[in-house]
UniProtKB/Swiss-Prot annotation:
Catalysed reactions, as listed in the record: orotidine 5'-phosphate + diphosphate = orotate + 5-phospho-alpha-D-ribose 1-diphosphate
Record protein name field: Orotate phosphoribosyltransferase
PROSITE patterns cross-referenced by the UniProt entry: PUR_PYR_PR_TRANSFER (PS00103)
Cofactor(s) required, per the database record: Mg(2+)
PANTHER family (UniProt xref): OROTATE PHOSPHORIBOSYLTRANSFERASE, URIDINE 5'-MONOPHOSPHATE SYNTHASE
Organism: Helicobacter pylori (strain Shi470)
InterPro entries with a match to the protein in the record: OPRT, Orotate_PRibTrfase_bac, PRibTrfase_dom, PRTase-like
Signal peptide: none
Protein's gene: pyrE
Known partners and oligomeric status: Homodimer.
E.C. code: 2.4.2.10
Length: 201
């Protein structure tokens, strides 16, 4: 399955000057919501991701995603794996588990995002779950921005990667674009970064 073509065909690979949720600036932005608005395509992508996870013989009892971006991807992945789905959300800028969701002690959970850049949001989600007694066994995403190391990729973890090296990251594709710290972003000399939809939006 050509993941890059899926994003291009859905007009989900945007070009411009963007402020990513990780804090980095980039000339490209992946808008997974445009890909996932097609239920059949969302199901196909989730099944492809689930196949990787199943081949790794991991025991996963639940999928959890940080809201809002990860919810559709996480729900479809949980459906493909045949496990329950929950999500965390921000309350006063702090990640929390609400809406009656609970986790069992030592429940094995995979944290799923639509896109993994540094993995910061995924780790905030994981921390909430671990504090409630759950066991994080893996991370998943439709796409990886190339900072974190994923299973089946030759790319190594880069500076800024937040995901722990001892847990696997499963993703369908690496999208490696130039990313800049705001203090040294060359794009800022000619334009202002826009935030197309993530934290605080």
């Amino acid at each position: 399955m050509d993941i890059k073509a899926c994003y291009q065909n859905a007009k989900a690979l945007l070009e411009g000057h963007f402020l990513l949720s990780s804090g980095f600036h980039s000339n490209y932005y992946l808008q997974s919501a445009k890909v996932l608005e097609d239920p059949k395509l969302a199901e196909q992508l989730a099944k492809e991701l689930a196949k990787q996870i199943q081949e790794a013989h991991l025991n996963i009892e639940c999928v959890c995603s940080p809201a809002i971006g990860g919810i559709l991807a996480g729900y479809e992945l949980a459906r493909a794996l045949g496990v329950r789905f929950i999500f965390t959300e921000r309350v006063d800028n702090t990640m929390a588990l609400r809406r009656g969701f609970e986790v069992k002690k030592n429940e094995k959970i995979l944290v799923c995002e639509d896109i993994i850049t540094t993995g910061k949001s995924a780790m905030e989600c994981a921390k909430v779950l671990e504090e409630k007694g759950a066991q994080i066994v893996a991370f998943g995403a439709l796409a990886n921005r190339g900072i974190c190391k994923r299973v089946h990729s030759h790319l190594k973890a880069q500076e800024g990667a937040c995901l722990p090296s001892h847990l696997p990251l499963f993703a369908l594709e690496d999208f490696v674009f130039d990313m800049h710290k705001p203090s040294s972003c060359p794009l800022c000399t000619t334009s202002t970064a826009i935030k197309p939809g993530s934290r605080g939006n």
